[in-house]
Amino acid sequence: MALDLVIRGGTVATAEKTFRADVGIQGERIVEIKENLKGNQTIDAAGKLVLPGGVDSHCHIEQLSGMGVMAADDFYSATVSAAHGGTTTVIPFCAQHRGDDLKKVLKDYHERARAKAVIDYGFHLIIANPDEQTLQSDLPQAIRSGVRSFKIFMTYDRMRLHDEQILDVMAAARREGALVMVHAENHGIISWLAGRMIKQGNTLPRYHAICHTRGSEAEAIERVIRLAELVDCPILIVHVSTPEGIEAIRSARRNGLKVYGETCPQYLFLTAKDIDIGLQGAMFCCSPPPRDEAAQEACWRGLKDGALHVYSSDHAPYRMDASGKLPKGDKTTFKEMANGVPGLELRLPLLFTYGYKQKRISLEEFVNLTATRHAQTYGLYPRKGTIAVGADADIAVWDPEKKLVIEKTRDNAGYTPYKGRSLTGWPVTVLSRGEVIVENGKLSAERGRGRFLAREPSEALKPLGREVPEISQLKAWNTPLQL
């Protein structure tokens, strides 16, 4: 019997291998991978690469920021942009601010995404109010509903947790089976420097990069690793930007700890020099900020040797006007600018061009860093993140020689920090669950076709079962620590 759809004659790549084969699709799933398949419909992939659709596990969509600014993208514009860039699954954040009821927060985000998303999605939680109700009732309920990861902040006045609160959240994650993601920067260092810069009249965006020091990231990463070790809680450090931070993660992993690292396009392709262009430098302001060429090289090494586990966009789109980056127009100080840069659409093409095409990484590593490890880490594998029999037919067919110069993207930020860069390689046909949703730059997906993905427990979030000496001593005394 003929299959519904066959992707014919392409070069298939997974995280393990690259090979020539047809990919046969029945309904929403991949059902056969071999040569000479017959289908009612075919996609000619001769001379092209057939890759898993990207999984972006760090993006901010229709979310109020820690500074109280709404992201420029809703779930429609963001997922349309993602799809055009070859990403077929996103895991954005449901943000709890202080005083927010976690159940209501999650309900609100479900309603937003259900009505608008054109690709499949999961959720992380942002925990800013770790009271007893949140930790003992609301969080366990959310985890059981398939939201198995949450993010905490060590900086931002509205969001940051102190060390005891972080330990409370980690203990809950360990009990319930969830992964803790950490924005690791030392709040005191940043706040102290920023206060003095503003007082001295140094208000331009370039001072943002000065205040968010390399040391503030390194210290916070080292500290949160120690906290996680105390309660045996796996953690993932998001948007790592410094050689010192990467080395702290590398050292922890060398010691057998479950500490994962993530980096993003802005730390591979931007530097602090991009910010130093007057007020327009706000376009490049994110936290932590881009660093220098040496830090870029450290990030590339981390991706190559595994210290950095995944490559995400940290898509945080804010317009260059009073609604986003410049709430006070040209009087806006760096402390008042919304932090973040758009990146959902260009995450994959940038890494393809400057990673794979320039031989910094292999094609298999490209797939691993952009899709497979995300799915494995966050409980979506093997349904997502690979090309395999039984997997969802989330596939991007890439023309590896297609050349273009970045001018604009399909998100709602109104700018891209990568404008003017040349790309070689672009996804020309994108499928989500067997449906062609993008072809040659044209969208054919209906608003709201995306589905929520309840995530399963993954190997990444399982505790090691390893104790620090003091916890072992408590057991020896028959007075074990109660998490």
Model-derived regions: residue spans:
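Histidine-rich, glycine-flanked metal-binding segment
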Residues: 1-53, 67
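Divalent metal-coordination and catalytic microenvironments
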Residues: 10, 28, 47, 58, ...
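Metal-associated gating/positioning segment near the N- to mid-region
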Residues: 45-116
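Active-site mouth loops of central-metabolism enzymes
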Residues: 59-73, 122-135, 210-214
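Alpha-helix-loop-beta-strand connector modules within alpha/beta enzyme cores
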Residues: 103-119, 168-182
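Histidine/acidic residue-rich metal-binding segments in metalloenzymes
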Residues: 136-311, 316
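His/Asp/Glu-enriched, well-ordered alpha-helical/loop segment
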Residues: 205-234, 281-283, 309-310, 317-402
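C-terminal cap of metal-dependent C-N hydrolases
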Residues: 325-333, 389-453
